[in-house]
Amino acid sequence: MNNPLVVALAYDGLCTFEFGIAVEIFGLARPEMGDNWYRFAVAGVEPGELRATGGIRLMVDGGLELLAEAGTIIVPGWRGADVPVPAALCEQLIAAHQRGARILSICSGVFVLAAAGLLDKRQATTHWRYTDLLQQRYPAIQVTPDVLYIDSGDVLTSAG
């Protein structure tokens, strides 16, 4: 039995809607999907207590070290398009991608993938309110507005 590990990122200021999508899809038992359904874990981007929007306390399964085991990594909507992405997170995402992990962003999580350089010379999408800003900041990305998602196989982006 091989249950691939899906890891969703959590961080202070996390948007619960996008995070909830990952939890609903991969975090619930799915016996109808067979024995090889995914394992699910939550990785804290930074140590210590994390609070999502609205002050909701988050419990994580570990830190960025979990990304080394993940077959799929989900980056929910980032805490703000103007908030810098930690270098350690970028490094872990690059390493995971290089070893073959799928990397997926939801909504403004695309800015994390862009900061890591994972979208250079690729098509990508995000929420319509961020498409112009994404294109301005990262001209090497082929921003495709007005689509719900772009699936490049190893990197996926969604509108959110």
Please give the residue ranges for each predicted region:
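Extended, subdomain-level signal for the structured scaffold at the beginning of enzyme domains
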Residues: 1-103, 111-115, 145
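Residues that mark the start of a beta-strand
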Residues: 3-5, 123, 154
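Short, surface-exposed amphipathic charged segments that create phosphate/polyanion-binding patches used
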Residues: 56-58, 139, 158-159
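Short, amphipathic alpha-helical segments
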Residues: 83, 87-90, 125-128, 132, ...
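Structural detector of well-ordered beta-strand residues that form the stable sheet scaffold
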Residues: 103-104, 125, 144, 156
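A conserved active-site-flanking secondary-structure segment within enzyme catalytic domains
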Residues: 119-148
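Conserved anion/nucleotide-ligand pocket segment
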Residues: 148-160
